[in-house]
Amino acid sequence: MIQMESLLKAADNSGARQVQCIKVLGGSKRRYAGIGDIVKVSVKDAIPRGRVKKGEVYNAVVVRSKRGVRRADGSQIRFDGNAAVLLNNNLQPIGTRVFGPVTRELRNERFMRIISLAPEVL
């Protein structure tokens, strides 16, 4: 469950290390974002010579969350931390690699490119 001010790990090689959620997209009263939801983020920590710089604002899709996601069969998948993949204005990934596992729920949310880049899909 991601809300404003939540810190997330960047799960790609865009150059960001840590990002902070500044808005949950999808309605003016929407408070929380889960796996597969798009959020507006600000880069809080970046590596030198990366594609993104500290302070820049991007769209991002949440790929892992501590809250997890419940499946239709009753099972639930949770992760140790919150992570997101940075997106450009066309909602395409900025990075060329995705680190760590992602869930199958991204397939429904038109993020097939992230699914194909991920090393493991749960």
UniProtKB/Swiss-Prot annotation:
Keywords assigned by UniProt, alphabetized: Ribonucleoprotein, Ribosomal protein, RNA-binding, rRNA-binding
A Pfam family reported for this protein in Swiss-Prot or TrEMBL: Ribosomal_L14
GO terms classed as biological process: translation
InterPro entries linked to this entry: Ribosomal_uL14 (IPR000218), Ribosomal_uL14_bac-type (IPR005745), Ribosomal_uL14_CS (IPR019972), Ribosomal_uL14_sf (IPR036853)
SUPFAM superfamilies given in the database record: Ribosomal protein L14 (SSF50193)
GO cellular component term, pick one: cytosolic large ribosomal subunit
The keyword RNA-binding belongs to this UniProt entry's keyword annotation: yes
Alphabetized CDD domains for the sequence: Ribosomal_uL14 (cd00337)
Function field: Binds to 23S rRNA. Forms part of two intersubunit bridges in the 70S ribosome.
Family to which this protein belongs: Belongs to the universal ribosomal protein uL14 family.
Subunit structure: Part of the 50S ribosomal subunit. Forms a cluster with proteins L3 and L19. In the 70S ribosome, L14 and L19 interact and together make contacts with the 16S rRNA in bridges B5 and B8.
Protein name: Large ribosomal subunit protein uL14
Species of the source: Halorhodospira halophila (strain DSM 244 / SL1) (Ectothiorhodospira halophila (strain DSM 244 / SL1))
